[in-house]
Amino acid sequence: MVADHGGAVLIASPKVAASLSTKPVWIAGAGESMGHSNMLEMSDFTATSAANSARDAYSMAGMGPDDMEMALIYDSFTITAAMTAEMLGLAPRGEGHTLWKDGHAAPGGKFPINTNGGGLSRF
């Protein structure tokens, strides 16, 4: 994985969250997966292990991509964002780029993605 910056998510108990001045976001599910340790081991360069992570998170949450309103996804390269959107079930395989091309991923679009600009905006 290419990494050039960091991020943080602060997780608190329901009791602490209730004492905060902002409305909390509840974590309904999580998933993590690694498909290979180096690119030479990849059998399919059009797929990522995000599909496995998504499957696990959706199962834990009892939800699916149609239940989400927006997403923040890893975007080390432009193609990474499009492929990850496909692996998360947000677009059919080979069609992830259309979320951006057609404006659906933009703030105010049908399914906003990386409304903070994503990692690529930090260069």
Predicted regions and their residues:
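Glycine-centered helix-boundary capping/hinge motifs
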Residues: A61-G64, G89
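Condensing-enzyme catalytic core mediating Claisen C-C bond formation in acyl metabolism
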Residues: M1-N52, D56, M60, H104-R122
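Short acidic capping loops at alpha-helix termini that bridge into adjacent secondary structure
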Residues: G64-E69, R93
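Feature representing long, continuous alpha-helical segments
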Residues: T48, N52, D56, D66, ...
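Short glycine/threonine-rich loop-to-helix capping motif typified by GTGT followed
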Residues: M39-S43, D75-H97, G109
